[in-house]
From Swiss-Prot:
Belongs to the ROK (NagC/XylR) family. NagK subfamily. This is N-acetyl-D-glucosamine kinase. PANTHER family: N-ACETYL-D-GLUCOSAMINE KINASE, ROK (REPRESSOR, ORF, KINASE) FAMILY. It comes from Escherichia coli O6:H1 (strain CFT073 / ATCC 700928 / UPEC). InterPro entries: ATPase_NBD (IPR043129), N-acetyl-D-glucosamine_kinase (IPR023505), ROK (IPR000600), ROK_cs (IPR049874). The gene is nagK. Zn(2+) binds at residues 157, 177, 179, 184. Catalyzes the phosphorylation of N-acetyl-D-glucosamine (GlcNAc) derived from cell-wall degradation, yielding GlcNAc-6-P. It is an enzyme of class 2 (transferase). Keywords: ATP-binding, Carbohydrate metabolism, Kinase, Metal-binding, Nucleotide-binding, Transferase, Zinc.
Length: 303
């Protein structure tokens, strides 16, 4: 059995998957915020409960926001303060007497989608998250590409390309990002960026769901806004695709629930790609909230 943990600032979610990649059991508990020992106990107790329930010693994978293992072997995860700065992988591997694998939550999202029954035919899968921020991951032959610093797939911290500034206007504001840089694309393409663009052009502070509701009602202003957003997304994604050249792009995050994102994007991409490039298949994520657990569990699938 494959045990997958999706760990965030408020909850520890465990999903148990069988050899057919089907979810058999899941359980959630609150994430301890202050005590590392309590955090380790919470994870180990869930593993012990799963072992008893299924009568086996399942493999353990964990998806967590941040950098799963720094140069000194410790976790960096600002949203999980009880475990940040601690040698989480080594400590859990020792306590559970098995190989525990960690990856960041964006890679786990991408891995979950790459192992969807319909998507396993594609060697190179790119996961793109358009949510509170912009992120994602790359999966090659069923394995995540992490890079030395676990930042592969941090697409949101690419800066706006020149052709985006040409399209939006050379006086378009380069907003300061939380990473400290200016002009990172997540400030324009995330859910918050979607709302910011609307306010920038129309001087109305609406949230993304409100704008999308207006779009669905045929509001001309909202429709013009969506056209502009999709054009900007296509420009930025075109730059990424020229480097990555995936077979499949799977889009997750809150904005993936807006059908125009996946249905109207492909037709805008060719003019931003090399003439010989083929547009990848573009799909909405299939596994929703379970994706983090699935991807974490599947860190062991290619053993």
């Amino acid at each position: 059995m494959y045990y997958g943990f999706d760990i965030g600032g408020t909850k520890i979610a465990l999903g148990v998957f069988d050899s057919g990649r089907q979810l058999q059991w899941e359980k959630r508990v609150p994430t301890p915020r202050d005590s590392y020992d309590a955090f380790l106990d919470a994870v180990c107790e869930l593993v012990a409960e799963a072992d008893r329930r299924f009568g086996c010693k399942g493999s353990v994978g964990i998806g967590i926001p941040g950098m799963p293992e720094t140069e000194d072997g410790t976790l960096y995860a600002a949203n999980v303060p009880a475990a940040s700065g601690k040698p989480l992988r080594a400590d859990l591997s020792a306590r559970l007497d098995r190989d525990v694998r960690l990856d960041n939550d964006a890679n786990c999202f991408a891995l979950s989608e790459a192992w969807d029954d319909e998507f396993t035919q594609y060697p190179l899968v790119m996961g793109l998250i358009l949510g509170t921020g912009v992120g994602g991951g790359l999966i090659f032959n069923g394995r995540p590409i992490t890079g030395k610093s676990y930042i592969t797939g941090e697409f949101g911290h690419m800066r706006l390309p020149v052709d985006a500034l040409t399209m939006m206007g050379l006086d378009f504001p380069l907003r300061r990002c939380g990473c400290g840089q200016y002009g990172c694309i997540e400030n324009y393409l995330s859910g918050r960026g979607f709302a910011w663009l609307y306010q920038h052009y129309y001087h109305q502070p609406l949230q993304a769901p409100e704008i999308i509701a207006l779009y669905d009602q045929g509001d001309e202003q909202a429709r013009a806004h969506v056209e502009r957003y999709l054009d900007l997304l296509a420009v930025c994604l075109g730059n990424i695709l020229t480097i990555v050249d995936p077979d499949l792009v799977v889009i997750g995050g809150g904005l993936s629930n807006f059908p125009a994102i996946t249905t109207q994007l492909a037709e805008r991409l060719p003019r931003h790609l090399l003439p010989v490039a083929r547009v990848p298949r573009i799909e909405r994520a299939r596994h929703g909230d379970a994706g983090g657990m699935r991807g974490a569990a599947f860190l062991h699938l290619t053993d």
